[in-house]
Amino acid sequence: MALSACNTETDSAGRELTVHGTAAFPIACYHDDLEAAPVPWHWHEELELLIASEGGVLAAAAGEKYTLAEGDGLFINAGVLHADWPLAVGRCRLHSVVFHPRLVGGSPDSVFCQKYLQPL
């Protein structure tokens, strides 16, 4: 699985249009240069784990703002509106792993998915 640049395009409701991975392997890894282009407000049906790989990141999700120092991470649940910006002027890079909930929870009807993933 390659690390790709993420170009976030959304529909009028803010839903990201990018397909993350494939039906057989629904996971993708991205790198974003926030100095060049912040990640705009968007949401998707996948889970996302992001890590500030260089510089500080201001991340917003579910109505909260989070300051991430280099090496810090944040988990974003499916369907949550979120965005990312550089914390200060200068180099700012973000790595993210975006994956479908069925990779960890199985079916949306499973006890694991309903009890542990959906409440997050």
Give the location of each predicted region.
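Generic protein-terminus/edge-of-domain signal
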Residues: 1-67, 73, 80
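A hydrophobic/aromatic-rich effector-binding and dimerization subdomain
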Residues: 2-12, 16-25, 81-120
